Amino acid sequence: MHNIHRRHFLKAAGAVTAGLVTANIALNANASSVAPKPSSGKSVIGLIAPKMEVVRVGFIGVGERGFSHVEQFCHLEGVELKAICDTHQAVVDRAVEHIVKQKRPKPAVYTGNDLSYRELLNRDDIDIVIISTPWEWHAPMAIDTMESGKHAFVEVPLALTVEECWQIIDTAERTQKNCMMMENVNYGREELMVLNMVRQGLFGELLHGEAAYIHELRWQMKEINHKTGSWRTYWHTKRNGNLYPTHGLGPVSQYMNINRGDRFDYLTSMSSPALGRALYAKREFPADHERNQLKYINGDMSTSLIKTVKGRTIMVQHDTTTPRPYSRHNLIQGTNGVFAGFPNRIAVENDGFGTSYHKWDTDMQKWYDKYDHPLWQRIGKEAEINGGHGGMDFVMLWRMVYCLRNGEALDQDVYDGASWSVVNILSEQSLNNRSNSVNFPDFTRGAWEHAKPLGIVGA
């Protein structure tokens, strides 16, 4: 949803903050020694929905991110774009115009207020809903979607509180509907190749990973009335932690089989001073501008360390403020070698190419030739043509539709979305308690121990 009135944001953010205070107290106990929350339904690990000959799609939010999804779905076979919803008429008109230009039927439109999306959910000719709205709407919209009998596909993060995570999981288990957080980075060419390398044992036993979202986004502060910065800026005044952990953490979690043989155990976190946003506002806005009246509290650099039940470690960082090159780190270290991204480089003992592990090998072509993921081999060229973050967006949506049409389980489930997103909340709880460790809830309720690892799919 392209726009949200500031008063609605402040109300929602205030509720989140209040919830965190309560959660901080509740999670001081050792969660690892507490039995998981009982379920009112059946686990959705490996959930397979009945095959859909055609996937009928509704879109909630067609602004920045949502419009990109509309564009990509227009390139996919076996889908119908049935309805769209947004509070901002201009982006609704743009989406409708684009769909019609692609020679697809004109979708139904729902707009007018923040709850117009419920009219879309009342339709009986929609199978899945793509949710691309401000963060505070993700959980309630996902829950409403599943309650309406539809599968929910949600932009990142999945939720903003531990309780929201549990509510989403409980709803998915009770309704037996998919709720997938659309972590597109898991479908990048490099990430898929590294997953293939890991599954073939190239790095030996895994020990350590590093993940990040380092992306200078101060310029979004100039988006005042519409677009992402019109609402995301305020989160830097409400929270102090890792606001956006999933882009880097998703791939590393899949390398390590998190929730499929291992799981996150506990986390410790700290943040640097919060200086950059205020300095930017002072430089770029008039002294009496609202951006200069805000108190920015989110540390410019957030660093968290995660320990898994199997003893592995993961560093997760967040920085959208300081001037530096983009990075997600994407590092995975095993007993036989290491891969690191940004830029891509690898060092492996006995790598088969006669290269010494004492220095980085940056010639990636031979590695692509040997380990390129079958999924990218099949549709990589089409993905590069259609775009979307280098093609990863197209691959993700293509794979979602393929699974739904062919009766296969999705690659990411609701437990993944909750586990990766909850770093947002736990990092803040740790920071507020002098960086003492905070335990992860076991969102799978113990099922992680027997869940099948994500394989190397060929379609």
From Swiss-Prot:
Q: Which InterPro entries match?
A: Gfo/Idh/MocA-like_OxRdtase_N (IPR000683), Gfo/Idh/MocA_oxidrdct_glycsds (IPR050463), Glyco_hydro_109_C (IPR049303), NAD(P)-bd_dom_sf (IPR036291), TAT_signal (IPR006311), TAT_signal_bac_arc (IPR019546)
Keywords from the UniProt entry: Glycosidase, Hydrolase, NAD, Signal
Q: Which reaction does it catalyse?
A: Cleavage of non-reducing alpha-(1->3)-N-acetylgalactosamine residues from human blood group A and AB mucin glycoproteins, Forssman hapten and blood group A lacto series glycolipids
Binding positions for NAD(+) per the UniProt entry = 64-65, 86, 135-138, 155-156, 184, 244
The enzyme's E.C. designation: 3.2.1.49
**Cysteine pairings via disulfide bonds:** none
Q: Which residues bind substrate?
A: 213, 232, 244-247, 326
Signal peptide segment: 1-31
Single GO term (MF): alpha-N-acetylgalactosaminidase activity
The UniProt PTM text for this protein says: Predicted to be exported by the Tat system. The position of the signal peptide cleavage has not been experimentally proven.
Co-factor: note: Binds 1 NAD(+) per subunit. The NAD(+) cannot dissociate.
Q: Which cofactor does it need?
A: NAD(+)
Report the sequence similarity comment from the record.
Belongs to the Gfo/Idh/MocA family. Glycosyl hydrolase 109 subfamily.
Purpose: Glycosidase that has specific alpha-N-acetylgalactosaminidase activity.
Q: What is this protein called?
A: Alpha-N-acetylgalactosaminidase
Q: Which organism is it from?
A: Shewanella oneidensis (strain ATCC 700550 / JCM 31522 / CIP 106686 / LMG 19005 / NCIMB 14063 / MR-1)
Q: Which gene encodes it?
A: nagA
